[in-house]
């Protein structure tokens, strides 16, 4: 099979890149080995919560503008403020078009979202039913918060969240109560209702009668004007519609919080992007992974100094049948997604054997204090790339292989709260670089073209 672009990885970076390529009319394929880290995510878009030195950030874009001078190795420094802003605006508009509106504060500042443990976490964009608390919590206008869960549901504990919220001094005037709700639908299922996860509950609540029962139960514990916090138990597609329906029935203000995995807020993003990709005519190769690639020298007369070119790749499911493309993007993630692996004394990129920006001493990979405020150095290690995010192998630049997302070096998404922002921005940048080179003459006019899907 031949494509204009093949993206290896089906997470935030890979799907962002794929959607932008399709918009420009490129014949695009995504190879996704399985569930991405979005199944474990909050569903909000973190652009920058802290600087690499650990200083809290209130205005991400203003702060990113200083990175070229203060943190020159950071992906944001390479991308620049203008590209990051363009990428995030594009992503917000794209997600709104495909049914998942994302909003931010009008003043350009981060906002706080509530975590399932009752902490406040800084983020940039959130989904419609994620309540946005101001960065200055003393300006919070909510007077009463009601934390409600489904009886027996293990992945959100209101009492624990309540105890932690009461530790936040700026919220000392906030009245916080908790409640458990039982559904009669539990009587009709074969399993113990304590075994149900968020996806199971979303299936039960797809029935209107069960939603009406839930709405009535919520009204017994809250009044209009209260902020009613519930676990994210409404899935993709109709999930947001169901939440609007319950708000209209109850006149309550609902706030979703992500649960322990699987997180339906994160899954909502992934499934919406994948569905849009297929609807636009993309080819999704699910449940497959790349095992190797074939390279050639760009300048065969001087191989020692020549750049490389990736000609084709081989996957586990397609065996000896290669996939070819003019351009490739590697967005396989970091250690969590097995985009990077580590052995006793070194780190490797397992598909192409790309060069890694890492310390030679294993003792430099980690902090001696496990809960160090500066996190662990290995989280900032990743692929060596050019300033245009082209991969490097054995010191040779690979002209047509770009890297995006968590596989990049020079930043710590956990410490900084920058994972989604870097993923979207670097994926968008890779797509823009590819589009500029290929400049297709023919654009897809029919958005209803169905994709070829290899299972």
From Swiss-Prot:
Pathway: Polyol metabolism; glycerol degradation via glycerol kinase pathway; glycerone phosphate from sn-glycerol 3-phosphate (anaerobic route): step 1/1. It holds the Pfam family FAD_binding_2. GO terms for molecular function: glycerol-3-phosphate dehydrogenase (quinone) activity. Its EC number is 1.1.5.3. Keywords: Flavoprotein, FMN, Oxidoreductase. Its cofactor is FMN. GO terms for biological process: glycerol catabolic process. InterPro entries: FAD-dep_OxRdtase_2_FAD-bd, FAD/NAD-bd_sf, G3P_DH_GlpB_su, Metab_Enz_Cyan_OpOx_G3PDH. It comes from the Bacteria. It catalyses: a quinone + sn-glycerol 3-phosphate = dihydroxyacetone phosphate + a quinol. One of its GO terms (cellular component) is glycerol-3-phosphate dehydrogenase (FAD) complex. Belongs to the anaerobic G-3-P dehydrogenase subunit B family. HAMAP family: Glycerol3P_GlpB. Composed of a catalytic GlpA/B dimer and of membrane bound GlpC. Conversion of glycerol 3-phosphate to dihydroxyacetone. Uses fumarate or nitrate as electron acceptor. NCBIfam families: glycerol3P_GlpB, PRK05329.1-2, PRK05329.1-3. This is Anaerobic glycerol-3-phosphate dehydrogenase subunit B. It comes from Aliivibrio fischeri (strain MJ11) (Vibrio fischeri). The gene is glpB.
